[in-house]
A protein has these predicted regions:
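Conserved Rossmann-like nucleotide-cofactor binding loop
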Residues: 39, 209, 233
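Hydrophobic/small residue at the entry helix of a nucleotide-binding pocket
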Residues: 177, 209, 217
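Adenosine-nucleotide cofactor-binding segment
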Residues: 197-206, 218-252
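Short Gly/aromatic-enriched secondary-structure transition segments
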Residues: 44-51
């Protein structure tokens, strides 16, 4: 079986390449990709900004050629026996044909940050699907801009409820970025800083990430929500997502 992928062979240059279907390691799976988002990081890499995790202990250079895509949803095509037993991140049973989403970062579980604090965001050896793995080496298919994607052993993934369509599930990774609001609310529980119920909040920019932060703010009980952007179209969407006041900065 040959699998096609959009490969970024160098900044500014994509090629459609084909790869053999990889044989699964124990603890791995193969996902048929339904949708994969285009992140700002993908654009920067295409433009030649090739530092990943810049300024952190995980800083690396993008290993071209690479298959991008870390905002992914798809259907389990093949599942190793180990995962049939262990299930997804929450140990929910999974099988071939189930829809899943993934955490794009792979953490080591052994560094100071992994063993002393919530390691997912801070791991000093973090690697990211679509950003950290070259397609020149087996198993090749380590990004979502391909017909199929390989999940290495240790990848966090989640079964998607049947009532959630792929066009919504693909936003899971973006929504996870709104976890910063959870941290801010945590801070407010033991200091006067942070964010708490009823606070007025300003959102600068209402692209996909801004809109999902806006949705999360509504869920968390924000008071007045004010949004700034240059696009009237996006500001209209922001109103539908619950913004109380929208301001076009180019018209102010």
């Amino acid at each position: 079986m040959k699998i096609r992928a959009a490969v970024l062979v160098a900044p500014g240059r994509y090629e459609v390449q084909t790869f053999d279907r990889p044989k699964l390691e124990d603890g791995a799976l193969l996902m048929r990709v339904e949708l994969s988002g285009i992140c700002g990081t993908d654009k920067h890499t295409y433009q030649g900004e090739t530092k990943q995790y810049a300024g952190t202990e995980s800083e690396t250079d993008t290993p071209f050629p690479i298959i991008q895509g870390h905002e992914n949803v798809g259907i389990i095509e093949e599942l190793s026996p180990a995962l049939e037993e262990s299930g997804d991140f929450y140990q929910a049973p999974v099988k071939v044909g189930d829809r899943i989403v993934m955490c794009p970062d792979m953490i080591c579980g052994k560094c100071f940050y992994c063993t002393h604090i919530q390691g997912y965001s801070w791991c000093s050896k973090s690697q990211c699907y679509g950003n950290s793995f070259t397609s020149a080496q087996w198993p090749h298919l380590l990004g979502g801009w391909a017909e199929y994607m390989y999940f290495k052993p240790g990848t966090f993934f989640y079964k998607v409820p049947e009532n959630i369509p792929p066009k919504v599930a693909v936003l899971a990774e973006l929504m996870a970025c709104a976890a910063s609001l959870d941290k801010l609310k945590d801070f407010s529980s033991y200091s006067i800083e942070g964010f708490t119920t009823g606070d007025t909040v300003v959102v600068f920019g209402v692209g996909p990430l801004g809109l999902l932060h806006l949705a999360k703010l509504g869920i968390m009980g924000a008071g007045k929500i004010i949004c700034f952007d240059k696009s009237d179209y996006r500001l209209e969407l922001a109103k539908k997502f619950g913004a109380d006041l929208t301001i076009n900065v180019d018209k102010t």
